[in-house]
Amino acid sequence: MSLLDKLRELGISENLIKEIEKFRSQYPVDKEYESRIPVPTQFYYGSDVWEQAITAVLCGENLLLVGEKATGKNLFAENLAGVFNRPRWDVSFHVNMDAASLIGTDTFCAGEVTFRPGPVYTAAKTGEIGRASCRER
């Protein structure tokens, strides 16, 4: 059963599901990033959370998932990326995290200095940052 079918089964508005389908066709994923689109093995149940999150994404808003450990934030993020057919990157923050770790840095490779992109650079390059509508930018 597809994620969209599971949303239907959960009682999510058919209008929202049609808007998700429109979003998917409007923002196709490059072939090189298709392997990063999650295929969740578990489904997040919570129709209110789903409807609010779907509406926010379709309106070009960002989401901040907050809660105690083991409350389903990562599971929901994985499900949401799968529903919208978007690639997913996991970035673990630590005490030594700096801008170069996120954006990228020059590195020495095969006798040449090359740029090694970080996750923020890669996400921006693939269009995953700034999906807000023009009037909101």
Describe each region flagged by the PLM.
Residues 1-137:
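AAA+ P-loop NTPase catalytic core and its hallmark functional loops
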